[in-house]
Amino acid sequence: MSNVKKHVSTINPVGEVLDVGSADEVQWSDASDVVVVGWGGAGASAAIEAREQGAEVLVIERFSGGGASVLSGGVVYAGAVPATRRKPASRFTEAMTAYLKHEVNGVVSDETLARFSRDSVTNLNWLEKQGATFASTMPGYKTSYPADGMYLYYSGNEVVPAYGNPQLLKKPPPRGHRVVAKGQSGAMFFAALQKSTLAHGARTLTQARVQRLVREKDSGRVLGVEVMVLPEGDPRTERHKKLDELVAKSACIRRRVPRRVAVNVRRSRARSARSATSVPAKVWCCPLAAISSIRNCWSMRRYKPGWLTGAAGCDGSGLRLGQSVGGIAQDLNNISAWRFITPPSVWPKGLVVNIQGERFCNEQVYGAKLGYEMMEKQGGQAWLIIDSNVRRQAAWQCLFGGLWAFQSMPALALMYKVAIKGKSVDDLAKKLRMDAAVLQLQFDRANAPARGEIEDPLGKSQDMRHEFKGGSLFAIDISISQKMFPLAVLSLGGLKVNEDNGAVIDGAGYDIPGLYAAGVPPLVWLPRVT
């Protein structure tokens, strides 16, 4: 008997495009003006908008709907709060555009950024029309995600001095709008869009996957899609649905259940998928809204070897469908790693250093920026060093500050179970195998700005500066390998699109007729770290 273990994968196979002379050559099983591939937030929005324009819409979804939107925090980035929506928006729009221009670093045009900023208030109002609810209550501290009852916050680097824009706004408004909900808001966010999709009369086909596109050979127009559909009423179809619900609840099954169980689930899902039947559907235009490639183990091994894969279903099938008809992919090696060290809100008062003991990043920046600096420039290894005063304040916030359990519990464990304690800088340097002189220099360079003598060399704002006055120090391992501190990742690369109309473009820069991209399949540009 062979001891070789067979790899079981649920990655969607995407076939070569089916080229035909005309639509009449295909025996279509269904037809619609618009077929949307993927029923997450972007797919739902595309379907609703198409219905409002009078088009017949068919939404095809591999699972039951929701995609990454359900697993998200349900946060919408927009340049307005309720109090400013009725005021002239030019000053706020210009400030938002300037900030985003700094963040995205040229990945999209200035015109697109300006349009996004200008339309963000309209987009927020549109979401409210679909049933989503927003509010303006804010937490009193910097956080990666606000607690229940708090629905507006600084969700990026807006308050970091290096990202500010004093010529336009002395203090930018918060732009992270969390959908009002109990618990993480992603489910409520998608529930509103799902309900609106159905209310608008869009048809849906769930537990079905698009395996290839159909193209008119001479014109290059995408005519339709070939879909694998699980048979209705089959026990395997019901099992597939239940297993997908299990995966959705756990967000990333390999982190929540034993590996043996995870493998069994993947095998069961693969067996269910093999019972599907193939049917072609004719379309007038086809928006791809299938989710990202962070779950595609082959793609991750190629572009980011050593990184773990993400949520189930994020296999890049929408991207590969676009590539099958000549769509161009860009920045597939651009993976955003989120190392949030707030809350506790006082942690950024500490020092983040590399394994040589050198400070390399402003500790108060957005988690994606810190994660980028750590992963791309420091080999995924870093330490957060705090003193007794910061640790005491952080512990109080974890216990009594109303934080989420996923924020407070890891922080407490890291401070009191994982952290390495040093009686002095020299003692800590010895335990961390660092040069004591190098580490001491970091504290000297941090203490002088804290006393107001000089500016912080990495641009930390005055309220986040902290003078270390001696006593015990605690080094917290915030590396990617730290099992008590999971590192979330998101793929940012994707299909290149015409920024004016969303059409997927080919290698020559021309629109591919009939094919559009929305959501994650097109190149993601928020945020783009520098």
Curated annotation (Swiss-Prot):
One of its GO terms (molecular function) is 3-oxo-5-alpha-steroid 4-dehydrogenase activity. It is a single-pass membrane protein. GO terms for biological process: steroid catabolic process. GO terms for cellular component: membrane. PANTHER family: 3-OXOSTEROID 1-DEHYDROGENASE, FUMARATE REDUCTASE. FAD binds at residues 33-62. Keywords: FAD, Flavoprotein, Lipid metabolism, Membrane, Oxidoreductase, Steroid metabolism, Transmembrane, Transmembrane helix. It is found in: Membrane. This is 3-oxo-5-alpha-steroid 4-dehydrogenase. Pfam families: FAD_binding_2. Inhibition occurs with substrate concentrations above 25 uM. Involved in the degradation of steroids having an A:B ring fusion in a trans configuration. Catalyzes the elimination of hydrogens located at positions 4 and 5 and the introduction of double bonds into ring A. Belongs to the FAD-dependent oxidoreductase 2 family. The chain crosses the membrane at residues 395-415. The lineage of its organism: Bacteria, Pseudomonadati, Pseudomonadota, Betaproteobacteria, Burkholderiales. It comes from Comamonas testosteroni (Pseudomonas testosteroni). Its cofactor is FAD.
